[in-house]
Amino acid sequence: MESVKKLPDSEMKLMELIWDSEPVRSGDLVSLSLEKHGWKKSTVYTILKKLVNKGFVINDDSVITSTRPREEVLSDRSEEEIERSYGGSLPMFLTAFLSREKLTKKEAEELKKLIDDYTEEG
């Protein structure tokens, strides 16, 4: 399976529709894509073929299902972006992110809990 970073925005947009609707018939996916993104049938099938070839979806008798959960793909994509833009430094990423706006008290508590949950012991 290909790396998530090889998924252009158009492929990620189609993946979002698939995750939200799966299993979804290809004709229904075309309708959803037209409604949500203004894409023609040929555009949807071109993108869909790329996703099948990359191993992100299965097209079984015109029924489309994903092969990877949304959370996994988004996590991989985030990790690759942090690696590319911040040299893999999570503190640098958080500094850049937090410099734009303050966290609410609830958001800060949630982040502290996540850090505690994922901190290595020893």
Summary of predicted features, one role per range:
Residues 18-22:
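Short helix-to-turn junction characteristic of helix-turn-helix DNA-binding domains
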Residues 12-17:
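Pre-recognition alpha-helix immediately N-terminal to the DNA-recognition helix
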Residues 24-33:
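Short acidic, hydrophobic short linear motifs in intrinsically disordered regions
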Residues 7-10, 23, 87:
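Short helix-coil-helix linker/hinge
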Residues 45-49:
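Short, hydrophobic-biased segments on the C-terminal half of alpha helices
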Residues 79-121:
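Amphipathic alpha-helical dimerization/coiled-coil segments
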Residues 3-10, 62-82:
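Short, cationic-aromatic polyanion-contact patches
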Residues 52-62:
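A short, conserved structural fragment
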